[in-house]
Amino acid sequence: MRSFLLLVTLTAALAVSAPAQIPFDNNRNQGVGVTVGLASGAGISYQEILPSALGYRAAVLAWKTGDSSFFDIGVSGLRVLSDDGRRRVYLLASMAWWRRSGEKAEVAFDDEGNLISERVFDDVDDSGAIGAGAGVELPLGPSAAISLEAAFTYWTDSGDLIPAPQASLHWLF
């Protein structure tokens, strides 16, 4: 909770200190990288900021090993509040969906410990999240940036509203 409050405070401080707006910058309106977040999803991501100060980000991650598989897809809508040419402060709305699957074996034994039956079944877990919050994009060099976000997230697994940090690392072009 402390790190979440720190991120909100940092975002608010940067929003106050970065009121200048610059014209749309074609050299930093798109980004490819990685995103990690409960509401935004996790994985390889693409981000684009449009001339209207609206933007979007999509993330996808998938893997399969043996009988197990995992799939995650997330999308975020962004509204830029402030952009001084180096950093952006924005609002975001995100949603993500995960699916984990695998096979489990259920065995039954008699009183003497002998195997009497074995049943294999699919074990599937779906969950989703939807969230809204604020973020800041900070430069890491001439063509790289890190985004730090704080989002209040509703998670379907628990039914709770969770204050969750999110982060992205993007190469801008």
Task: Enumerate the predicted regions with their spans.
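Selective for proline/serine-rich intrinsically disordered segments
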Residues: 1, 17, 21, 49, ...
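Gram-negative (and chloroplast) outer-membrane scaffold detector with strong preference
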Residues: 47-148, 166-171
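Solvent-exposed, flexible loop/coil residues
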Residues: 28, 144, 158
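Transmembrane beta-strand segments of Gram-negative outer membrane beta-barrel proteins
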Residues: 24-36, 91
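Solvent-exposed loop/turn segments connecting transmembrane beta-strands
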Residues: 32-44, 62-71, 85, 154-164
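Cleavable N-terminal export/targeting peptides
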Residues: 1-26
